């Protein structure tokens, strides 16, 4: 049966097993990771793809920091193709949600003086996923960043390619 084919993920941070050809979808309490972890079934049957997952998973927080740096750069550059999407995301969470929520989302700050760049530091990695991008026809990695999922379900979603380069930043809710 399928259970005979259990594979161990090649990563340092957790001891994780999976069944090739079956989707991985794990909440933090299941995996021991501090974020949601998911991999499309198309990839779990491919050992090379899963090696890439393990390697990227070990560096997830580094990738999140790279994502935050990219968001800050896009905020500062009006010519960036991501400028409007990241600016709207920050504006929404500072100016549209109401002062009580702002105080909860950004504890210890003065919302009146809070810059968008400072807000980026409050983003936390909530999901690390991998799937096959249909347009590129290659494996990609997706990081969901959120301020506080208990308060807001708005996400900054950052797509990385196999070279750990960002090729898309979107806002999802």
Which residues does each predicted region cover?
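Acidic, proline/glycine-rich low-complexity IDRs
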Residues: 7-24, 117-173
């Amino acid at each position: 049966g399928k259970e005979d084919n259990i594979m161990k993920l090649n990563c340092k941070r957790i001891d994780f097993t999976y069944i090739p050809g079956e989707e991985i979808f794990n909440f933090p309490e299941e995996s021991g990771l501090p974020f949601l972890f998911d991999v499309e079934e198309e990839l779990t049957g491919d050992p090379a793809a899963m090696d890439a997952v393990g390697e990227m998973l070990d560096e997830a927080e580094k990738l999140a920091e790279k994502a935050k740096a990219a968001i800050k750069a896009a905020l500062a550059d009006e010519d960036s193709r991501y400028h409007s999407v990241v600016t709207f995301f920050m504006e929404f969470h500072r100016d549209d949600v109401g002062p009580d929520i702002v105080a909860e989302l950004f504890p210890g700050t003065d919302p009146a003086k809070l810059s968008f760049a400072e807000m980026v530091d409050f983003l936390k990695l909530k999901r690390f996923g991998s799937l096959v991008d249909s347009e590129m026809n290659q494996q990609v990695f997706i990081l969901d960043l959120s301020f506080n999922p208990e308060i807001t379900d708005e996400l900054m979603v950052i797509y990385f390619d196999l070279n750990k380069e960002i090729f898309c930043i979107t806002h999802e809710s």
